[in-house]
From Swiss-Prot:
Protein family membership: Belongs to the UPF0246 family.
Source species of the chain: Burkholderia thailandensis (strain ATCC 700388 / DSM 13276 / CCUG 48851 / CIP 106301 / E264)
GO annotation, biological process: response to hydroperoxide
Transmembrane segments: none
One GO CC term, this protein: cytosol
The protein, known as: UPF0246 protein BTH_I1090
InterPro entries from the UniProt entry: YaaA
Amino acid sequence: MIIVLSPAKSLDYETPPHVSHHTLPQFADDAAALIDELRRLSPQQIGTLMSISDPLARLNFQRYADWSRTSTPANAKQAVLAFNGDVYEGLDARSLSPDDLDYAQRHVRVLSGLYGLLRPLDLLQPYRLEMGTRFTNARGKDLYAFWGERITHALNAELKTREGASRVLVNCASAEYFKSVKPKLLDARVVTPVFEDWKDGRYKIISFHAKRARGLMARYVVEGRIGSPDVLKDFASEGYAFDEAASNDDTFVFRRRAGA
C-alpha cells in the first residue's frame, strides 16, 4: 500500500533534521530542466505567474538561481522534514522514529510540481512551484503536460513490487496534485479518504482541518504499519470516525463534530 500526499508551500530549513539518512529524488533531471526554464523569468513574471507578492516573487527568483543539480545536506533537507504546512503538522515527521521514517520511505510518496514524485527522505532544495501553475514549458502548456504519465509509471513500478492485495494507492493528496496521476493507468485500487467537520448544520470539508487530517492519516499508516485499506476505517485521530453510510468502496468518509 502506498499513500500519496501533496507538498507544502511553507518550508522549514531552520530546524536541524533528527536523522542523517537521505536519498536523492528520482526525477532530479526533470526538476533541473524545469529550473532552467524558470530561471528565464524575472521576479515580476514569477509574481504574475504564481499570483504571489513581490517579496515572495523575489525570494523564489533567488531560490531558482541558487538551486543546484547536486543536492547535499548542505543545500537541501529530507522532504518530509522540510515541508511545513497543515498536512505536515498532522504528520509531524520530526517526532517519528528512524524506524518509522524507514517505513514511510517505502510507503509514503509526495507529489511535487518541481520534483514530480518524492520519497520522504529525498533531499529537497527550497522551491515553490505548485502543480496547478500554468507554466508553459518545453513539454506543453502546464505542469500536467510536463509530467505526463511519468508520475503514474513511477507509482506503478513501485506498486508492482507489492503483493496483489497490497496494490492499493491511498489518495491523501489534493485534487490539484492528484490530477498529475492517471488513475485509469494505475495497476492498483485507489482509495480516497475524505474528512468532514460539522459546521452550520451539516458536514462539510473545511480545508485546514482536512489537510491536517490527511497528515494524521499518513502518520496512522506509518506508526501502525498498515497494509490493508480496511484497517484505515479504524482511524480515529482527533475525534474523526469512519462513517460507513456516507462511504463506498473507493471513498472512505470520516466525520467529526466540534468537541468530539
